[in-house]
Design a protein with these regions (language model features):
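Charged active-site motifs of nucleotide-sugar-dependent glycosyltransferases
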Residues: 5-6, 38, 113, 150-152
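Active-site neighborhood of phospho(di)ester-bond hydrolases with catalytic His/Asp-centered motifs
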Residues: 10-11, 38-44, 68-75, 118, ...
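Extended active-site neighborhood of metal-dependent phosphoesterases/phosphodiesterases
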Residues: 55-150
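N-terminal active-site segment of His-dependent metallophosphoesterases
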Residues: 1-63
Length: 155
């Protein structure tokens, strides 16, 4: 394990209106300047969870290059007004962006265990995220089974 881990943590790209491309460009320039070991993006990549917004978000994520990127959805990454989609496939467009990986993830990076929990709760009021007992157990197990001296980060 290295003595130091550099993390670039960001959120709220809000691709779609009011997305600002120059802010994304500045973020990618910052990543080049500080050369983080890992990038963490904690939600709200989109404004309204539309496919075209996820395409824009993907271009930003791809701009981080070969660095590990931990991404978790936020409340804006599930449809708000498309009720049918929100009820029956709230993470459908998210999966077109992120692939079929789980919504809760464990990432190991240079002596660190990073657990990312999805708190977006599409069937609740849009501003009320939730982490349930199963997710807490998921994080606990990941941390307990990891290297004893590993740094532990929860997103």
């Amino acid at each position: 394990m290295s003595d130091r881990l550099t993390v670039l943590h960001t959120s709220d790209f809000q691709c779609g209106k009011p997305y600002l491309p120059e802010a994304a460009e500045a973020l990618l320039e910052l990543a080049e300047d500080i050369d983080p070991d890992v990038v963490i993006v904690s939600g709200d990549l989109t404004q309204r969870a539309k496919k075209r917004e996820f395409v824009t978000a993907r271009s930003i994520i791809d701009g981080f290059g070969a660095r590990p990127v931990v991404v978790t959805p936020g409340n804006h990454d599930v449809p708000l007004y498309r009720f049918w989609e929100r009820l029956f496939d709230p993470f459908g467009n998210w999966r077109s962006f992120a692939g079929e990986r789980a919504l809760d993830t464990v990432t190991m990076v240079d002596g660190a265990i990073i657990v990312s929990l999805n708190s977006a709760a599409p069937l609740r009021a849009i501003v009320n995220g939730r982490v349930d007992d199963c997710q807490v157990d998921f994080a606990r197990q990941a941390f307990e089974t990891g290297e004893r001296d590993a740094l532990r980060l929860l997103v």
